């Protein structure tokens, strides 16, 4: 998994900066992780790195909203952590008039457009739900504030959240190989004849070249389209090396 984290700046002794540094350091054990700040070239990193997930950690900034929109246009999954900046106190006591304008111009739109929000407590989740902008909100506690939670556990829970988001929008991630594989799987799965030459060699090679992530997306698609039994029949007939994945247990 390839992840880009965006934050306005990294500051020594800053609570949010400490959180992000601990999160990204732990995540690097399980994923390819990059961090970019306001001073970095976000668009270039997005094009060069081609992330699966863009995680925005900055609220009330037009540049952050622009980056979220740009990443979405590039078919990246975008998640947003407001870090308590959307609770009532932050909205109504700090730069109240300015934030009202920003809400109308871009902040509410950003929240509605991202794939999901990630917050650190149920109270923060409830505060955001009251706004009515989105219901797609998950919780992973902050190891900086919760000493009983290790950085590693926080990283793993966050990556599980990313996986949930990716599984929800799997069709955006489907490659040409997967899209070409679907008709082949259906052809063999539905075929009445039992000959060994049910597919041309190039189509058979395509099926045998699929990796576990590609099979995962194919299985999710097959479940959603009601063709899983046909796909499984093809896998059995051709003795394809497909992973065993219980898609019914996948949270989306």
Where are these predicted regions, by residue range?
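C-terminal alpha-helical cap of glycosyltransferases
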Residues: 140, 144-145, 149-174
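Short N-terminal targeting/anchoring amphipathic segment
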Residues: 45-64, 77-79
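Membrane-proximal helix-turn-helix segments that form the acceptor-binding/catalytic region
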Residues: 100-116
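The feature captures the alpha-helical scaffold/lid subdomain characteristic of nucleotidyltransferase
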Residues: 107, 166-252
């Amino acid at each position: 998994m390839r992840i880009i984290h965006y934050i306005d700046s990294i500051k020594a002794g800053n609570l949010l900066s400490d959180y992000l540094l601990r999160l990204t350091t732990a995540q690097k054990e399980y994923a390819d992780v990059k961090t970019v700040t306001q001073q970095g070239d976000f668009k270039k990193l997005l094009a060069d790195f081609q992330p699966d997930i863009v995680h925005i950690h900055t609220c009330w900034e037009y540049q952050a909203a622009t980056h979220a929109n740009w990443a979405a246009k590039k078919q990246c999954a975008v998640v947003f952590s407001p870090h308590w900046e959307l609770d009532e106190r932050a909205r109504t006591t700090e730069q109240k008039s300015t934030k009202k304008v920003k809400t109308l111009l871009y902040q509410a739109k950003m929240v509605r457009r991202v794939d999901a929000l990630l917050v650190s407590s149920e109270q923060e989740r409830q505060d955001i739900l009251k706004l009515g902008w989105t219901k797609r909100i998950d919780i992973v506690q902050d190891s900086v504030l919760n000493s009983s939670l290790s950085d590693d556990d926080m990283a793993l829970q966050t990556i599980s959240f990313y996986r949930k988001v990716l599984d929800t929008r799997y069709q955006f991630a489907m490659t040409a190989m997967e899209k070409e594989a679907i008709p082949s799987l259906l052809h063999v799965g539905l075929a009445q004849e039992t000959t060994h030459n049910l597919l041309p060699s190039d189509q058979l090679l395509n099926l045998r070249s699929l990796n576990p992530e590609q099979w995962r997306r194919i299985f999710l698609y097959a479940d959603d389209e009601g063709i899983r039994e046909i796909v499984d029949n093809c896998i059995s007939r051709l003795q394809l090396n497909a992973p065993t994945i219980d898609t019914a247990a996948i949270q989306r």
